[in-house]
Amino acid sequence: MLHNPEKVAILYWLHLKEHTDVFTQGYVGVSTRLIDVRFREHCSRFNNSYNQYNPLHLAFAQYGVENIIKTRLCVCSIDQAYRLENIFRPFEYMGWNTAEGGKLSKTAINIIKSKYT
């Protein structure tokens, strides 16, 4: 991975109140910012570019952003956070995630490539 191993990150879980299984339900992510800041970014993307194929966007639309719970799972090095994320999301499209843990989605990679090529 190409991350600064010294940088601190948060492994977080976005889920509904009734969700009990972090391995199969909700969204697991990594951020080097506060969870509330990262959550606002997710909400902004949802509000500005709704994607009907994005499970997190579908959850926001179906359940309402106000019903999503933000849970901090771990504060650790960024490398450790991505390794843990991969344990919770080893495959694409698990829970509300589109990419396997520790990796960018193909859509994100294509956007980055288009900006720099």
PLM ranges: what are they?
Residues 1-117:
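Structure-specific nucleic-acid interaction/processing domains
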